[in-house]
Amino acid sequence: MKRFAMILLGCLLAGTSVQAGEPGVKQTIAYVQKLQAASGGFRSHEPKPDAVKILPTLRATSAAVRALKYLGGDVPNQAACVKFVESCWNAEAGAFSDEPKGKPDVFATAVGLMAVTELNLPTEKYAKAALKYLSDNAESFEDIRIAAAGLERLKAKSPQNDRWQGEVKKLQSLDGIFGKELGQARATGGGVVTMLRLGAKYDDSAPILKVLKAGQRQNGGWGKADSETASDLDTTYRVMRCFMMLKARPDNVEGLRSFVAKCRNEDGGYGIAPGQLSSVGGTYFAAIITHWLK
């Protein structure tokens, strides 16, 4: 059954477009929709009958809403989803938390802004305070990376923009490359995308594209520095986002399609890597990568 599903998906991905009514895509939409809880938020994955209860989070909700967009599906209970997102906003801190009444943080604030814009909510309630919070609190590369992505959705520029660029540049070589050896493609993809979002220009993208293309592994995807062969959808997403922003494509597109198909499970969802349990994050990565490959 799993082999049939992978073959079917491979056929769908090879086409010029993916329609929500196609069987494989329809099943994936249903998988994401079933993750919505009564509170309106989405869970990160389906709980097993005998497992500990899985609570919805803002991070999972933001990923689910964006996945459904690229799959051509709808949020089943959009009004409840909006209320859940709003309940994660901490007006005093000017930031989002991952759960209602939780502790605000940079990542939750950035993905919260993505959910706000994806659900077509008025941004005025959040924009000014969230901009200040992200500007004051984003310090590490990962913080700056996700903060830049969230502010991009607001079309806003942080007063810390130049400082952020300076911090990211510390990780970059003269030819625009980030990282070393097996981790170079992932690091370069994430680093270059962050710099582009912060307003940097790359007059010569050839060295960057060379690293990205060389990093594609035998199974068609991209992976972390801890393995020569393993790939995952998170790393593959970072690299493909860079390709898209540089208006380029990998050399082995069919290999990439095959890798994405291997991450698909019988429930219609996608794991972060082949053989892993389906999750909303893995399904979002698969949906947007597939969209880029049209």
Predicted features along the sequence, with ranges:
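Positively charged n-region of N-terminal signal peptides that target proteins for export
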Residues: 1-4
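Bacterial N-terminal signal peptides
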Residues: 6-15
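Sec/Tat signal peptide C-region and signal peptidase I cleavage site
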Residues: 16-20
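Short N-terminal segments immediately surrounding and downstream of signal-peptide cleavage
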Residues: 21-37
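An alpha-helical repeat/solenoid feature that recognizes helix-turn-helix modules
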Residues: 21-24, 44-76, 95-126, 136-162, ...
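Buried hydrophobic core positions in alpha-solenoid tandem helical repeats
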Residues: 32, 85-86, 130-134, 167-168, ...
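Acidic carboxylate motifs that coordinate Ca2+ or other divalent cations, activating on Asp/Glu
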Residues: 39, 175, 219, 267
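A structural feature that tracks compact, well-ordered secondary-structure segments
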Residues: 211, 259-263, 271-274
